[in-house]
Amino acid sequence: MLEQLKADVLAANLALPAHHLVTFTWGNVSAVDETRQWMVIKPSGVEYDVMTADDMVVVEIASGKVVEGSKKPSSDTPTHLALYRRYAEIGGIVHTHSRHATIWSQAGLDLPAWGTTHADYFYGAIPCTRQMTAEEINGEYEYQTGEVIIETFEERGRSPAQIPAVLVHSHGPFAWGKNAADAVHNAVVLEECAYMGLFSRQLAPQLPAMQNELLDKHYLRKHGANAYYGQ
């Protein structure tokens, strides 16, 4: 069942240590099939160097039930499911504790758009969620993590298609894309922007966001209706 998608999700998960986004097993990647009926996700707590495509777990999106796989799915499965159910434009999701993005998450800070590297991928600041309540933490924690991400985008009027990443307060980053590989790509860029942003703020503590005109130019030339970047 979904053998190609399992292979794709395995490859995306293996890309996390290759890009230095994870330590030990601190991360996961998932993707949905074309019908958006099924999600394939990394198994919980399995080391990357022994993981195979057969270890990937198939979960029904509507019910959250495991329909194929001998291992337990990632503990973050309910977060992934919440995002897939809410946003049809998301086809793949990555969660990591990558060092510099997690620094911003732990500080509870949005990552401003300070330069064109950021603007090429994210149409504005990458938001950090609010702190979760005690009830949310002690209840269905992973599901509520997804809900607080959705709340952040909806209350701020942000588009998850235009800003394909979020920082979860005191936790770490999630990134997404049209498929698993695209989500990993965005997670790599997020980590690089977080790294550059940390030093930019140290050098210039009052640094304002980049010019709106420059943000528009770089984002829209790649992603706008009249995009002209690339082949």
From Swiss-Prot:
SMART domains: Aldolase_II
Reactions the enzyme catalyzes: L-ribulose 5-phosphate = D-xylulose 5-phosphate
Keyword tags: Carbohydrate metabolism, Isomerase, Metal-binding, Zinc
SUPFAM superfamilies, per the entry: AraD/HMP-PK domain-like
Record's keyword annotation contains NAD: no
Highest taxon of the lineage: Bacteria
Binding site residues for substrate: 27-28, 44-45, 74-75
Textual note on the cofactor: Binds 1 zinc ion per subunit.
Task performed by this protein: Catalyzes the interconversion of L-ribulose 5-phosphate (LRu5P) and D-xylulose 5-phosphate (D-Xu5P) via a retroaldol/aldol mechanism (carbon-carbon bond cleavage analogous to a class II aldolase reaction). May be involved in the utilization of 2,3-diketo-L-gulonate.
Enzyme nomenclature, EC number: 5.1.3.4
Active-site residues (renumbered): 120, 229
Gene Ontology process terms (BP): L-arabinose catabolic process; L-lyxose metabolic process; pentose catabolic process
Family classification: Belongs to the aldolase class II family. AraD/FucA subfamily.
GO molecular function: aldehyde-lyase activity; L-ribulose-phosphate 4-epimerase activity; zinc ion binding
Residues that coordinate or bind Zn(2+): 76, 95, 97, 171
Metal-binding among keywords: yes
Endpoints of the signal sequence: none
Pfam families cross-referenced by the UniProt entry: Aldolase_II
GO CC field: cytosol
Protein name: L-ribulose-5-phosphate 4-epimerase SgbE
